[in-house]
A protein has these predicted regions:
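Conserved beta-strand-loop-alpha-helix hinge in the C-terminal portion
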Residues: 247-265
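Cationic, low-complexity basic patches in intrinsically disordered or flexible, solvent-exposed regions
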Residues: 22-23
Length: 265
């Protein structure tokens, strides 16, 4: 139920457009602290006497304003990382730092606040309220946040200005996903977390959605994390984190990420 509730309060951040680095002072030394840090994070699920290690000591970092791609096969641990990062689940051990705060130590109440104000989710399925118009779906999300963006500006930004009075059943799959992204964007949190956001879309529509996400990162300075099984999409990431069997197999910084228009798969 928590998962379904949080799907309906999707958001994005309109944070500072520059990629900012954070640091903390220890004695006379300044030590760099990334915007997001996973430090030896483990997530173990118990099913009777059986323990399933969904994550087994994940370590990586993401800077503010980066477009990060987390890639791996089904069952590798990608969605677990996203759920932990977004406060949808809690780590068994290890630290999860977001914007200098240890999310892994948050109380249930603080996790709820964190999800509402700081995190935006975009999923493979759109989870729109069917009897509300495009504008009403976006407006619904703004009612539970502190500093929402202008609804009409956000709808225009995702290319749905002329569809704002339509209901979800009157929209294509790509248009419905744009509404989900607009709903996220309108809430104005810190992070946009995308779990296979093009999985239910055809090739061309999927490219349009990825371009919208990439533009959101580049033009608004939003930190965007996309998880995918499609390794071709790693070319568009500033940072590529490959996950295999519950561990981080590799982390690559891409000095020249490609626009999604130049990527084929």
């Amino acid at each position: 139920y928590l998962y379904l509730m949080d799907i309906n309060i999707l958001q994005i951040s309109n944070s500072d457009c520059s990629v900012m680095q954070q640091s903390v002072n220890i004695g006379h030394e300044e030590v760099h602290m990334s915007y997001i840090e996973f430090q030896n994070v483990k997530k173990i699920y118990k099913m009777g006497d059986v323990k399933i290690k969904a994550l087994n000591g994940a370590d990586f970092s993401i800077e503010k304003g980066e477009f990060a791609v987390i890639a791996g096969a089904s069952g590798a641990g990608k969605s677990t990382i996203l759920n932990l990062m977004g406060g949808m689940d809690t780590a068994t051990t290890g630290k999860i730092i977001v914007d200098k705060e240890n999310v892994s130590k948050f109380s249930a109440k603080k996790l709820t606040t964190y999800r509402r104000y700081d995190i935006g989710f975009v999923f493979q399925f759109y989870n729109l309220v069917q009897n509300l118009t495009v504008r009403e779906n976006v407006e619904l999300a703004t009612q539970i946040c502190k500093n929402p963006l202008d609804i009409d500006e956000v709808i225009e930004a995702v290319g749905l200005k002329d569809r704002s009075s339509n209901f979800p059943s009157q929209l294509s799959g790509g248009e419905q996903q744009r509404v989900a992204i607009a709903r996220a964007l309108a809430k104005n949190p810190k992070l946009l977390l995308c779990d296979e956001p093009t999985g239910a879309l055809d090739y061309n529509t999927g490219k349009q959605i990825l371009k919208l996400l990439q533009d959101t990162c580049r033009k608004r300075g939003v930190t965007v994390v996309v998880i995918t099984h499609n390794l071709a999409l790693t070319a568009m990431g500033d940072k590529v984190i490959k996950v295999k069997n519950g561990i981080v197999d590799s982390v690559t910084v891409n000095e020249n990420p490609l626009p999604v228009e130049q990527i084929e798969w």
